[in-house]
Regions:
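Charged/polar, solvent-exposed surface patches and flexible loops
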Residues: 54, 77, 94, 107, ...
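A polyampholytic, Gly/Pro-enriched intrinsically disordered region
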Residues: 103-117
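Conserved RNase H-like, two-metal-ion catalytic cores of nucleic-acid enzymes
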Residues: 1-107
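Short aromatic/hydrophobic-glycine micro-motifs
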Residues: 61, 113-115, 164
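A broadly conserved amphipathic alpha-helix scaffold signal in soluble, globular proteins
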Residues: 73-76, 106-110, 146-153
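Acidic, Mg2+-coordinating catalytic module of metal-dependent nucleases/exonucleases
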Residues: 117-180
């Protein structure tokens, strides 16, 4: 926990998108500010990970993710923790990149890092033992976190420049409520007419 300074990029892989109803948390990927990547397979018997939980709950460390609505929900549900101090690149992109409707991680990596992400391994059996995952699967999982620090930096500059940082921060505050709605079965937009 002491090796992480100001921020980490986080992502998860799961057996599907129905958490907590059906699916399980399979992998957790972390990238520190220096580009060191950690791919962690939680103990599926009890999901106890006290060192990881202490990092996730540390308010001094910003947790950067893309569509944290899913990852934060899965991590908090399975690890029984409360993740503090987040930056969601998907929310930031939707608020500040109004010149496009393309807000996927692949699009952000292309625009800000000039790299092409291969998303073909996305639908994989992530629940098998980590030693049975292919190099391509591990590379896919790692690529979901390796670019997030740079993307955050670029989006944050844009949010400040366009005077949208306050509304972005309000969205991050609301995310806990959105996750609670999801976990209570209200996956639709409750504000819709």
């Amino acid at each position: 926990a002491n090796s992480f300074n100001n921020s980490i990029a986080i992502d998860t892989e799961a057996t599907g998108l129905q958490i907590p109803e059906r699916d399980k948390l399979s992998l957790i990927q972390i990238c520190d500010e220096k580009g060191n990547i950690f791919v962690i397979q939680p103990n599926k018997d009890n999901y106890k990970a006290p060192n990881l939980v202490s990092v996730l709950e540390n308010e001094k460390i910003t947790k950067i993710g893309h569509f944290l609505r899913f990852d934060k929900s899965a991590l908090e549900f399975f690890l029984k923790c409360k993740i503090k101090n987040i930056f969601d690149t998907k929310i930031a992109s939707k608020i500040v990149r109004t010149y496009t409707d393309s807000h996927g991680l692949k699009n952000l990596v292309q625009e800000f890092c000039n790299k092409s992400l291969d998303k073909r391994q996305g639908s994989s059996d992530w629940n098998k033992d980590i030693n049975e995952l292919t190099d391509k699967q591990i590379e896919y999982a790692a690529n979901d976190v390796v670019y997030l620090h740079k993307i955050k930096g670029e989006l944050e500059k844009m949010l400040i420049r366009e005077n949208r940082i306050d509304i972005f921060n309000k969205c991050l505050t609301f995310l806990d409520t959105r996750i609670a709605l999801d976990q209570s079965g209200f996956k639709f937009d409750i504000f819709e007419h």
